[in-house]
Regions:
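Acidic donor-binding loop at a coil-to-helix junction in glycosyltransferase catalytic cores
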Residues: 231-238
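Acidic donor-binding segment of Leloir-type glycosyltransferases
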Residues: 64-108
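N-proximal low-complexity "stem/linker" segments adjacent to membrane-targeting elements
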Residues: 1-67
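Glycine-rich, basic loop-to-helix element that forms the pyrophosphate-binding segment
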Residues: 110-127
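Conserved donor NDP-sugar-binding/catalytic core segment of glycosyltransferases
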Residues: 144-182
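Short, flexible, basic/aromatic active-site loop/helix in glycosyltransferases
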Residues: 184-205
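Catalytic core of nucleotide-sugar-dependent glycosyltransferases
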Residues: 254-262, 267-289
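Short aromatic/hydrophobic "clamp" motif used to bind/position activated sugar donors
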Residues: 132
Length: 289
């Protein structure tokens, strides 16, 4: 059993030490049950959707990717499922993917529940793309999200460092988001997020990696992936780790919708764990500077 909520304060003291978190799940098999890989044309971007017992909102998430318009590069969708099989060797996600029957979608099933963060790691391992676009199984992309991501990744930048992390601007929604375009929302300046900014603001500024946040696969793996020792702030720590060697920037437009609902993050204990984990991250950041 993998526990994503445990906070190891000692690990925070060695935050920049490399830990191979992919090794922690190497004995858990993941089987491809839908889709094909012929190796003829490798995608440039892989959209990953880790999932667990999700139904209707997963359909919305997948459809928001399948309805992308005017994408000038090769891309794929990977759904990686933590849900155990029922008596008929089915899961809600497997049924959905089979019914959609789209060649862009591949479905993988974990033989053991890895938890949310280590399922991100597994999805990144499985991604064929140079860039990995993150999408929660209840969130959505704008209809031109991949087009905007391609534009931003190809924009010439005045930096000697490689871009490693593109943090998606998003809007919150409930119920239905629809097939909306990024141009329906006000343009915003593209921000550079770095470790100095973490000291000033007290956070990375990136938020949860979803709604089109796109990370260089090389950078994700070099950072060691999500580490459950960092508790509920593991995704913020990953962004902070990537900042050390790569540039981290925001998009200049909204490219996705974040579904706001009653969930575990509103639980009192979860909120207290977030506060403690964030305090440990900031203690490390200030100690290093």
């Amino acid at each position: 059993m993998f526990d994503s909520n445990t906070i190891n304060a000692i690990t925070y003291e060695k935050l920049d030490d490399y830990v191979d978190n992919f090794q922690k799940t190497k004995d858990v098999r993941t089987n491809m049950l839908f889709g094909t890989r012929d190796g003829s044309e490798r995608p440039w971007v892989t959209v990953i959707i880790p999932t667990f017992y999700r139904k209707e909102s997963l359909v919305d998430a997948i459809q928001s990717v399948l309805h992308q318009q005017d994408v000038a590069f090769q891309w794929e969708i990977i759904v990686v499922d933590n849900t155990p099989f029922d008596a008929n060797n089915q899961t809600p996600a497997l049924k959905i993917v089979a019914e959609l029957e789209d060649q862009k979608v591949q479905y993988f099933h974990n033989e053991e529940n890895l938890g949310p963060g280590y399922n991100w790691n597994r999805a990144v391992e499985l991604a064929q793309g140079e860039w990995v676009c993150f999408l929660h199984d209840d969130d959505v992309l704008c209809r031109d999200a991949l087009q905007q991501i391609g534009r931003l990744l190809n924009t010439k930048r005045n930096s000697k460092r490689k871009l490693g992390y593109l943090s998606a601007r998003k809007v919150e929604f409930q119920n239905k988001f629809g097939l909306r375009l990024s141009t329906e929302f006000p343009r915003q300046p593209q921000e550079v997020l770095n470790r100095f900014g973490v000291l000033v603001c007290g956070h990375t500024g990136a938020g949860a990696p979803t709604c089109g946040t796109t990370i260089l696969k090389e950078a994700y793996i070099k950072a060691g992936g999500i580490n459950y020792d960092f508790g509920p702030s593991a995704d913020a720590v990953l962004c902070y780790q990537i900042m050390r060697d790569y540039d981290v920037v925001t998009t200049d437009c909204v490219i996705g919708g974040y579904r706001w609902d009653e969930n575990a993050t509103l639980n009192k204990q979860t909120l207290l764990d977030f506060i403690r984990a964030d305090d440990l991250l900031m203690a490390y950041a200030y100690q290093k500077n």
